[in-house]
Curated annotation (Swiss-Prot):
GO terms for molecular function: 2-succinyl-5-enolpyruvyl-6-hydroxy-3-cyclohexene-1-carboxylic-acid synthase activity; magnesium ion binding; manganese ion binding; thiamine pyrophosphate binding. Pathway: Quinol/quinone metabolism; 1,4-dihydroxy-2-naphthoate biosynthesis; 1,4-dihydroxy-2-naphthoate from chorismate: step 2/7; Cofactor biosynthesis; phylloquinone biosynthesis. Belongs to the TPP enzyme family. MenD subfamily. This is 2-succinyl-5-enolpyruvyl-6-hydroxy-3-cyclohexene-1-carboxylate synthase. The keyword Manganese applies. Gene3D superfamilies: 3.40.50.970, TPP-binding domain. The lineage of its organism: Bacteria, Bacillati, Cyanobacteriota, Cyanophyceae, Synechococcales. Catalyzes the thiamine diphosphate-dependent decarboxylation of 2-oxoglutarate and the subsequent addition of the resulting succinic semialdehyde-thiamine pyrophosphate anion to isochorismate to yield 2-succinyl-5-enolpyruvyl-6-hydroxy-3-cyclohexene-1-carboxylate (SEPHCHC). Pfam families: TPP_enzyme_C, TPP_enzyme_M_2, TPP_enzyme_N.
Amino acid sequence: MLQTLQQQGLRHVVLCPGSRSGPLALAAAGLMRAGLITLSTAIDERSAGFYALGRSSASGVATAVITTSGTAVANLLPAAVEADRSSQPLLLISADRPLRLKNKGANQTVNQEAFLTPVCRWCGSGPLDGLSAGLDQELQALAQNAWRHLHQQPGPVHLNLPFEEPLHPDLDQQSTFWSQWNSSESVAITHNPELCKPTSHSEAPSLDPDQPGVIVAGPWRGLSATLEPYQAALIAWQQRSGWPVLADPLAAIPSNLGGVIRSWDLLLPNGLSQLPANAQVLRLGSMPASRRLEAWIANQQGPQLLITEGDPRPLDPLEIAEQWSGGLAQWWKQLNPRLRVIDATKPDIEARGGSPLQAWRTADLELQQRLYELLPGHGPANEPALMFALARLLPAELPVMLAASSPVRDWQAFAASDTGRRRCYSFRGASGIDGTLSLALGIAAELGPTVLITGDLALLHDSNGWLLASAAQQPLLVLLIDNAGGGIFEQLPIETTPRDGFNQLFAMPQQVDPLALAAAHSIPVRQLACLDDLPSALEWGLGSAGPTLLRVCTDRSSDAQLRRNLRKALQQSKSLS
């Protein structure tokens, strides 16, 4: 079964400990020794699931997790939920007890086959009385079905395999099997690569590029194989229409895309000149993490089209856009040829049809200049200034992962000058903070040197990720913004009496030394004294061959007020009004 998965594209397996899963462990080890897959181990199934999800997201190809029976399977649910909502392939393989032991009080025997069903694209099972010899064709078919469902509409797939005892062959049996096994033997693969392309059975709706409009690019949720065609289609439509682009940091837009308004988050709601009443909105993927943008989109009166990369589920919380799931590249191809040709005899495309592009560009550049004045790169660290500095100091094209709380929002607002220079990741399908470190380690395993920007609670929540970091030695710089609790709650209209109740009920600061915790896992650590030291600290962290932790202490209350003051100052700026 594993060999069939490998021949379809499986490259990496994450193995968790267990006895019932022993046959799967031995099979995976055999493929690893033959050089067919790579293998890593993790004692925490929740961490393993997120690590595999990070690898899948970075590579665009499903990574597999193998677990034993019982609560081990339940611990895969958080990663499966995120894989489902963010449309990423994730293969979850669990060993189980045979049917004869179910619902009889047998040890470590639960109805695990149903645990992941609500969020999986497909759930497959081996024979309920246990796997046995002579089932090669059935297992190959099971593997092929799993791989097809993983990538046809990307998401999690669960294979539950009951095993009857005896579970563990002796050394002579193992030696005999591997000596006769043919690692190059191929099976008939019925998987069709075309199934991995976004599809829609409806005719593609059109917009009018000769009329005013705006492009809103949300988080990219397609496979790596479809990213380049997506980017090419995005460039083509923007060149044809001249529309401005408001892009989420996770949108994976190309660096040569025209019309990008980088500081839209700080310019909204009053810093962008009003669109004509009939302006169209082309929305790509899910909504960016901005309530200001969501409110602004809701106020637009013209036609709206939402295009997803193969996800047919409703993705418009505003319920005002027509949705099409065939993918942007296919949409561009299906447009009337007349709509895909720029007429050189017409006036400059930025001036046609009341396009606001030039005015928005001017406001964007002026706001960026104001940020240089308002956020100097020296003195004590604060979160807006830190993000603004990181956008300039981090090497271009170095991947960045942003924890799904304050970091992704602050990057969107204050690191906007970085838009299009690098791939940014943040797992906002379900927007949980669990698995943050493990996800980043998975990304680094696939892409090489990576930076994780996280808060203290998100890092502590996945502290078992340090076990993976210590063992795998991935080149990951963890930049910890330690503001003693949940800083995101300081930015919400939450009031408590007395004030101390806010910490107890919402911020929940923890009395843990993150430097000591990382050092206990043999992770090199460093504390940032001030913003002046940031360049040398980044050089230290990025110069390491393995994981490192750089801690930056900030004040969440004063930083929340600073954000409000910055937005007010920028909105009141004469040059931007």
